Design a protein with these regions (language model features):
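Domain-level signal for soluble alpha/beta catalytic cores
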Residues: 1-246
Length: 246
């Protein structure tokens, strides 16, 4: 609640970003202490700093932006953001990244209790599914219609980001990616086919960009994945069976 109130004040220009971050720091420190109290050996920050579980991470990449729009979801109209490619996708480790600050803070809190910190990031497929399938945009300002080049650069950007986290002491990353479960939903698959793609083609994109993203990962870094049927305001986004994409 404290973070919600501080974020509302920040959005209304009532407080500076540093003041919002101080509130986030305080509440995340309390969360980590509670996780340890309940016996967790790997702790997270609960993504307390994020507005969107995936977009706030993806905004760390150069060449990526978002589009605001209204969309009818689960029986009601909602104001949402979707990701867009606006240039060459890359990750610059020399920039000051909010997500790296978040990691450094979490790692420091975890070290106070002798437990490990886990960093959660959204997967590379989310860039593809928002731009090409959710928004239905066929080309990009930098790549044109060359989706192979897009896949290659997204993979390289993830490699650079993973290496940056490693250099900051991260040894456990969880990649969250609901894009796979878009493709179990017959309604969404029909939309994909209406755009001129096939389910097999899109799944092939996902396999290749996800594989590329993990190339050259440090041998002693643990990388896990998570996917589900989405959770938008307490309701699933997709319906179907996982075995249709397994």
């Amino acid at each position: 609640q404290e973070i919600k109130e501080a974020r509302a004040k920040f959005n209304n220009n009532e407080i500076a970003y540093e003041q919002l971050r101080d509130v986030e720091d305080e509440q995340i420190a309390k969360l980590v202490a509670k996780e340890v109290q309940h016996g967790l050996k790997f702790v997270t920050d609960g993504e307390f700093r994020r507005r969107w579980w995936h977009l706030d991470w993806l905004k760390e990449f150069d060449g990526f932006t978002t589009k605001h729009l209204d969309k009818f979801i689960n029986g009601r109209n909602n104001h949402i953001e979707l990701g867009m490619i606006e240039g060459k996708i890359s990750y610059d480790p020399n920039k000051a990244h909010k997500e790296m600050y978040a990691w450094d803070f979490l790692k420091n809190e975890a070290s106070k209790y002798g437990v490990e910190a886990k960093k959660c990031i959204s997967g590379p497929n989310m860039i593809l599914i928002d731009h090409f399938l959710q928004l239905g945009i066929k080309d990009t300002p930098y790549y044109g219609t060359d989706i192979e080049a897009v896949i290659d650069d997204i993979g390289l950007a993830y490699q650079a980001a993973i290496r940056d986290f490693y250099n900051h002491g991260c040894r456990y990353i969880q990649i969250d990616d609901t894009s796979w479960t878009y493709m179990i939903d017959d309604t969404f698959v029909s939309k994909v086919e209406g755009l001129g793609y096939t389910k097999a083609q899109v799944l092939d994109w996902f396999v290749r960009v996800s594989t590329k993203a993990l190339e050259n990962r440090p041998e002693d870094m643990q990388i896990a994945t998570h996917f589900c049927k989405g959770n938008f305001k307490g309701n699933p986004l997709f319906h179907g069976f996982y075995d249709t994409i397994a």
